[in-house]
């Protein structure tokens, strides 16, 4: 295993500093804006999805270099962000959210997207969430606030 397994990243992201770690056998694409770097691992023993891409709270498994490049490009171009949900400060689950979805963000949207809209509601399993992007100017933390009618609104905190 070695650095040669990550050459394809240099071809696409040469304007970013990349650090290869022999001890961890991974490449880290350095984020010039924050500490949320992109880490790519290659695990050849996994014949189906040998690449793991990590950004912020999230990770994804990929089977080929092209999909890895596409995912990283989406992050760097700020088309997708990492979103993580919490309950009492503990991670519950997460995923990605697009720029368009962020522009129309509502509790109802998050509930539908998460799948917690049946007998178990999103509000029953989480109480806050965080959004992180390549450029932290769009990062924020948020909580759910309930009004007297039972309606839920999102209140952003730690907005950059």
Which residue stretches match the model-derived regions?
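Amphipathic protein-protein interaction modules
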Residues: 66-121
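N-terminal "first-domain core" detector
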Residues: 1-35
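Generic recognition of long tandem-repeat/solenoid scaffolds
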Residues: 25-32, 50-53, 93-95
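Hydrophobic beta-strand residues in large extracellular and virion-surface proteins
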Residues: 9, 27-29, 38-40, 50, ...
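Surface-exposed polar/charged interaction patches
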Residues: 12-19, 75-78, 116, 128, ...
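Short linear motifs in intrinsically disordered
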Residues: 17-20, 36-45, 83-89
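Intrinsically disordered, low-complexity regulatory segments enriched in Ser/Thr/Pro
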Residues: 34-67, 111-160
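Histidine (H) residue identity feature
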Residues: 12, 59-61, 100
